[in-house]
Amino acid sequence: MEAAAQFFVESPDVVYGPEAIEAQYEYRTTRVSREGGVLKVHPTSTRFTFRTARQVPRLGVMLVGWGGNNGSTLTAAVLANRLRLSWPTRSGRKEANYYGSLTQAGTVSLGLDAEGQEVFVPFSAVLPMVAPNDLVFDGWDISSLNLAEAMRRAKVLDWGLQEQLWPHMEALRPRPSVYIPEFIAANQSARADNLIPGSRAQQLEQIRRDIRDFRSSAGLDKVIVLWTANTERFCEVIPGLNDTAENLLRTIELGLEVSPSTLFAVASILEGCAFLNGSPQNTLVPGALELAWQHRVFVGGDDFKSGQTKVKSVLVDFLIGSGLKTMSIVSYNHLGNNDGENLSAPLQFRSKEVSKSNVVDDMVQSNPVLYTPGEEPDHCVVIKYVPYVGDSKRALDEYTSELMLGGTNTLVLHNTCEDSLLAAPIMLDLALLTELCQRVSFCTDMDPEPQTFHPVLSLLSFLFKAPLVPPGSPVVNALFRQRSCIENILRACVGLPPQNHMLLEHKMERPGPSLKRVGPVAATYPMLNKKGPVPAATNGCTGDANGHLQEEPPMPTT
């Protein structure tokens, strides 16, 4: 990958110090009140001071389910990029990259240059971020296969790439993990040969020792723990069992019901390590969230948003945003990897069904013109296990919407999702953005005491199907709103205004001095090319509309 373009914000509100970037930022929003059936909108403004530490740490990532398809693929991706590997395929030679990663392959607009063109820089250039090639991996798995064998079992990567990676992955072996049969499908028992023995309390202590050992032996400044193991069944929230931090810790000590993922979450929090849940079950029960609050440790979840659901969070936003009343959404999937085999059990499927079904809720609620209170589209989700297709998941969707005057519109979409190749860059982004958030603090004029983000890191919602948010906060599922949130918070950290896409300087008849139009100004009524049709572009497009040549209009007679 090319080095990220450097930039500096020249403003009296931004100071680049040796240790931190400090930026003054005016946060403008609105508050709405209701008086006698009338909505009154009150613009508000809050002055923030953001401080972002510039020193990038040595970061370790521990994956629960390291030997699964996602874990082995992410490890292989980082190694392939670090080693600058390339390999032949039937369509030509491929080179390692980080396509699919928001931080590594996404860009941010800085503004307009002297010619009126937008200038874009890589997402990773906005603030100092850990370089993905510098990440150090470790983790746990109930299967004892080393990472090279796990990579081969997954059947995700081309054979030529696997052969080059084999000697680098063969020495990587997962630590023993926690196996509680009633939480995952019975068909997973054949893999379970690498287990932490003992009581729940003993297992918790062993996980904590593993985290400390990894941090110490690898010389790390920080560790982030990420659950990418099997989907578990939901764990019932019961007062006295897992509703408070104290009760949850007592439950573990007494050996009562607690899921493996919650054990890992508790261990991570107690060790001061951020924990991210990439599966749909309710790992972060109220007691775990309270524990994270007490220890001021970031947690995030739930369920990686990678393929079908990511498309859904765009398409439904488009339909409802266009004024179409979506009334039926039917989503069918079949896949053949281990995730699909585990989801073939009813209780595990139910966890996934819930996370995939709730993704349209906020978009429906945003339009009371279309939907009356309590009204929502019919939404059906089906997942089937078909071993032959492996990691290449097929997703078929049908969206039916009502049009004006009784009409209907139906969209049918087929999406072939390379499951782990879509999930791996999301896991990468989760680790890098979480670590970055750990270096950001801020205060306001009204509250000058520095603080950090809420322990429930809702900024990560772009990357999750069922995003966790702080109590009382709105849940946002619309993809572009989620991306804008991340982009605009990073912009605020360097004193830049939010990206509003207005481009007013290009829409005014007479832009004022502060909105001076830059670049060449087109004639009020531009003439077409007098030499005939627009020449063909290099991509084969001529620019002709529906096959009609662009001809010179007749000159007005005098």
UniProtKB/Swiss-Prot annotation:
Cofactor(s) of this protein: NAD(+)
Pathway(s) the chain acts in: Polyol metabolism; myo-inositol biosynthesis; myo-inositol from D-glucose 6-phosphate: step 1/2
Q: How is its activity regulated?
A: Inhibited by mood-stabilizing drugs such as valproate (VPA) and lithium.
Give me the reactions it catalyses.
D-glucose 6-phosphate = 1D-myo-inositol 3-phosphate
> Region (Disordered): which ranges?
537-558
Q: Which tissues is this chain's protein expressed in? A: Highly expressed in testis, ovary, heart, placenta and pancreas. Weakly expressed in blood leukocyte, thymus, skeletal muscle and colon.
Q: Which organism is it from?
A: Homo sapiens (Human)
Quote the cellular component terms of the Gene Ontology held in the record: cytoplasm; cytosol
Homology family: Belongs to the myo-inositol 1-phosphate synthase family.
Q: What's the pH dependence, according to the entry?
A: Optimum pH is 8.0.
Swapping S357D leads to an effect described as: Decreases activity
Pfam families assigned to the protein according to its UniProt record, in alphabetical order:
Inos-1-P_synth, NAD_binding_5
Task: State which gene encodes it.
Answer: ISYNA1
Enumerate the UniProt keywords alphabetically.
Cytoplasm, Inositol biosynthesis, Isomerase, Lipid biosynthesis, Lipid metabolism, NAD, Phospholipid biosynthesis, Phospholipid metabolism, Phosphoprotein
Q: What class of enzyme is it?
A: isomerase
SUPFAM superfamilies recorded for this chain? Glyceraldehyde-3-phosphate dehydrogenase-like, C-terminal domain (SSF55347), NAD(P)-binding Rossmann-fold domains (SSF51735)
What conditions trigger expression of this protein?
By glucose and lovastain. Up-regulation is prevented by mevalonic acid, farnesol, and geranylgeraniol. Up-regulated by E2F1.
Q: Which molecular-function annotation in GO is an example for this chain?
A: inositol-3-phosphate synthase activity
Compartment(s) where it occurs, according to its Swiss-Prot or TrEMBL record? Cytoplasm
EC numbers for this chain:
5.5.1.4
Q: What is this protein called?
A: Inositol-3-phosphate synthase 1
